[in-house]
Amino acid sequence: MGVKGQLLQDPFLNVLRKEHIPVSIYLVNGIKLQGHIDSFDQYVVLLRNSVTQMVYKHAISTIVPGKAVSIPVPAETLPE
């Protein structure tokens, strides 16, 4: 993934992690996972519920926060 993708992903995932916001993660095969984001890197997200699961980002279709979140958007990602 390019740098631009990381500029959007990282702040979004970081807010979800720091604020312990519950999330629903939908995988490309239709499976829904629920929990809290413990950690993430370039390739995986650690999702914690009763157990901790390592979910590969390429398998994720959508991440839905349990409540509205506001993320800091770097100036270079704003349209001109």
Curated annotation (Swiss-Prot):
GO terms for biological process: regulation of DNA-templated transcription; regulation of RNA stability; regulation of translation, ncRNA-mediated. GO terms for molecular function: RNA binding. InterPro entries: Hfq, LSM_dom_sf, Sm. PROSITE patterns: SM. Residues 10-69 form the Sm domain. GO terms for cellular component: cytosol. This is RNA-binding protein Hfq. It comes from Nitrosomonas eutropha (strain DSM 101675 / C91 / Nm57). The lineage of its organism: Bacteria, Pseudomonadati, Pseudomonadota, Betaproteobacteria, Nitrosomonadales.
